[in-house]
């Protein structure tokens, strides 16, 4: 019985210490400045979209990744030392960009309540790239990103809650493939490290 009382006192003492430490930490934390106001769902999604589209922060955005590429460079596919397509980098920057445009346009359509057709296979979202339309493709990529950002900006809160995970996933998808574009450009020798990635 005496052991139980000692355990209760130790437990109570630990709770008091925990509460005291928590209050002390909170009291020492400065109030956020106006630029550090808490994020809303909308502002967090817009920040994600911009960081993968046109705002260099943690990584190189897609607009920078495709800037300055010629149509000829955009169709280049890495080959291994035997002259075969490298299985670790089997897409050109153009194919990767076409894939990004396809899926971002698909997501935009769904956000607008449309029912865009899904591809028969994901391969066709890469393989339908035509180097003759490279400049148009780069413009479409920029425009679809602006359109998605505008939709998120104006969307009612209840609808935004329904599409939030899709918007977050397309941002992650964009960052992933932008990294691949940079990898291919580095292999090709067409990437300028001054643009963000050494």
Please provide the spans of the model-predicted regions:
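Short, contiguous alpha-helical
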Residues: 38-40, 46-66, 74-123, 158-198
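Acidic/histidine-rich alpha-helical segments that form the ligand environment
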Residues: 125-158, 168
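Boundary of Sec targeting at the N-terminus
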Residues: 27-28
